[in-house]
């Protein structure tokens, strides 16, 4: 090899090196511009929304999407504000086809973002009046604590193994439902609006979450820790700001009514989900539960406005299964901590309403307790009610209180004292639909199962 060849080869190697460095630098810059996401939510028959968060230096965002196998892609630009401290982005897609697979790409400052996971979603099927209700599954869980040592309490870290989210991402399901305490505000967070925004943004950005969020649509309620301080109630001075932040970081269909609360509703197949808000309207737990021997009608758990909405929504529902979703347990009579049981006026009102109007198929779905269980409430002359509690995802595990260790309401073999999530599957022919609950551990192992037929939660 002569000197010229040596110089030529050296030049080629150098050019490859420079190209690699530039490519790596551009990829690193792109990744820094994308804080978290993207993921698809509120996926309906002909519409969907895409969520992501970008950094302060980003000036514009758009996405391209197409049905799977199609050559032509559509472009939608984000028209909202950017270049702020926190920049959650929502882009709505309309005019879609039902029961269709879609793929999408994110572009930040005209650069396509390369991601280690697929970005896709499937619109709902138009099954009504045409075919049997589709079988489906969904995931659910509560209490996601992300460690940040400088702001955490001294001692052992409260947050657990976040690999549970990789397990959830790999578990086939149509959507995931967050049951509250989806992040944990600390003392440094809930004393300012900026602090609330920081916590939501910081915890959502964790790498372990990204594949789960992208793998299926996400729905959510909140509890105290992602609303404000521990056991927070209607007195929290930043409750309106907290509501806005929650709405910024999730893609629920709506967010309360009249700019109050976060309650909403969605449907999948022959199931309706009533996502309640147990914080915005809530009275303090220690307010008198009864006055002169009568339930105190001024002590609110859901509040009058939300209770009226819930009752009317239940009356309107024709679903086989009606899931009332709450951040706190509802039916556990031995729960000494936060529970709707301690708000007897609203609790009695709701149960009497279910009885009077013969509302069938009701299942309560709750979080908060740092252990899982299924609670049964027998009712004279009516079907029993069930409360499925799923907790925790990554926060600390807690045993039941001594007073409820041998709770006669608890279904046998459903006490779960480890990190877990639930997979709930609805299947079967019309009038013989069944619900199967699997408690699944962080490594994907099935810890316990429970099953019930629609006939068992129907007034005969």
Feature annotation, model-predicted:
Residues 29-460:
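Metal-dependent phosphoester/phosphodiester hydrolase catalytic core
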């Amino acid at each position: 090899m002569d000197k010229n060849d040596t110089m030529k080869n050296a030049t080629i190697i150098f050019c490859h090196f420079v190209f690699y460095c530039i490519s790596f630098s551009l990829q690193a810059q792109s990744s820094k511009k994308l804080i978290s996401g993207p993921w698809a939510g509120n996926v309906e028959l002909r519409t969907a929304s895409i969520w992501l968060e970008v950094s302060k230096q980003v000036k514009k965002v758009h996405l391209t999407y197409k049905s799977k196998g199609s050559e032509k892609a559509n472009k939608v630009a984000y028209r909202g504000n950017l270049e702020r401290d926190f920049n959650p982005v929502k882009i709505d897609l309309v005019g879609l086809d039902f029961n269709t697979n879609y793929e999408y790409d994110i572009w930040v400052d005209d650069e396509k973002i390369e991601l280690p996971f697929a970005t896709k979603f499937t619109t709902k099927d138009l099954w009504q009046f045409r075919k049997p209700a589709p079988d489906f599954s969904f995931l659910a869980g509560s209490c996601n604590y992300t460690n940040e040592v400088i702001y955490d309490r001294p001692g052992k870290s409260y947050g657990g193994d976040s690999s549970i989210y990789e397990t959830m991402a790999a578990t086939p399901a149509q959507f995931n439902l967050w049951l509250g305490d989806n992040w944990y505000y600390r003392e440094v967070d809930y004393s300012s609006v900026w602090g609330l925004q920081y916590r939501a943004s910081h915890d959502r950005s964790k790498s372990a979450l990204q594949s789960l969020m992208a793998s299926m649509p996400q729905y959510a309620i909140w509890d105290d820790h992602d609303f404000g301080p521990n056991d927070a109630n209607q007195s929290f001075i930043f409750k309106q700001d907290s509501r806005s932040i929650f709405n910024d970081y999730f893609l629920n269909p709506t967010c309360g009514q009249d700019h109050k609360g976060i309650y909403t509703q969605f449907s999948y197949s022959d199931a309706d989900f009533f996502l309640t808000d147990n914080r915005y309207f809530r009275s303090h737990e220690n307010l008198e539960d009864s006055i002169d021997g009568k339930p105190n009608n001024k002590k609110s758990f859901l509040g009058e406005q939300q209770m009226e909405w819930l009752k009317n929504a239940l009356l309107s529902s024709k679903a086989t299964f009606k899931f009332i979703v709450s951040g706190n347990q509802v039916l556990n009579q031995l729960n000494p901590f936060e529970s709707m049981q301690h708000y007897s006026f609203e609790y009695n009102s709701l149960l009497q309403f279910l009885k009077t109007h013969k509302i069938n198929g009701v299942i309560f779905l709750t979080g908060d307790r740092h252990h899982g269980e299924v609670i049964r409430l027998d009712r004279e002359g009516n079907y029993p009610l069930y409360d499925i509690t799923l907790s925790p995802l990554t926060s600390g595990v807690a045993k039941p209180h001594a007073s409820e260790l041998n709770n006669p309401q608890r279904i046998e073999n459903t006490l779960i004292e480890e990190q877990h999530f639930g997979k709930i599957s609805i299947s079967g022919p019309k009038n013989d639909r069944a619900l199967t609950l699997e408690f699944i551990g962080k490594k994907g192992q099935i810890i316990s199962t429970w099953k019930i037929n629609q006939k068992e939660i129907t007034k005969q």
